[in-house]
């Protein structure tokens, strides 16, 4: 049986958690990241999302090497789909930097938004946690 394949915007906190737990292959964030690597998830992004990844992953509080940050960017650009932002969303988020993730997801109807903390986002079926994405993928 072929595993499900999906499009998804991956929030920065999911990437951070996946890299921090990369030695724990059973963590849901690691499984989501692995699904990107093996082609089951096609990540959606734009330049603002890439900039957010680089800025957050480059913070001194994280034990990431420059190569880790570059690898994430190369991965997204190589296997991902670059999209624009929709302008149809007029909601409010506690963190204004989160809006771009939601708007890029709104640019592709059949996509998901994978978030570690979904409580600050509109309750929509396409806004999912890493655990929910693992289930959607049938992992």
Language model features with spans:
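Short, well-structured N-terminal submotif of metal-dependent ribonuclease cores
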Residues: 1-43
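Short, active-site-adjacent cap segments at secondary-structure transitions
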Residues: 15-16, 51, 120-122
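Residues that scaffold the ATP/ADP-binding catalytic core of kinase and kinase-like folds
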Residues: 17-19, 56, 124, 136-137
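Active-site neighborhoods of divalent-metal-dependent phosphate/nucleic-acid chemistry enzymes
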Residues: 77-113
């Amino acid at each position: 049986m072929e595993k499900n394949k999906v499009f998804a915007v991956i929030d920065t906190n999911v990437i951070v958690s996946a890299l921090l737990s990369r030695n724990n292959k059973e963590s849901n964030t690691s499984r989501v990241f692995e699904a990107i690597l093996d082609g089951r998830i096609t990540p959606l992004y734009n330049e603002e999302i890439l900039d957010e990844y680089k800025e957050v992953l480059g913070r001194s509080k994280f034990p990431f090497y420059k190569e880790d940050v570059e690898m994430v960017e190369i991965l997204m650009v190589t296997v991902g789909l670059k999209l624009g932002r929709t302008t149809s969303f007029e909601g409010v988020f506690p963190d204004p930097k989160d809006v771009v993730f939601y708007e890029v997801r709104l640019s592709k109807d059949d996509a998901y938004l994978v978030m570690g903390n979904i409580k600050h986002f509109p309750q929509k079926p396409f806004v999912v946690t890493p655990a929910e994405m693992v289930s959607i993928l049938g992992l």
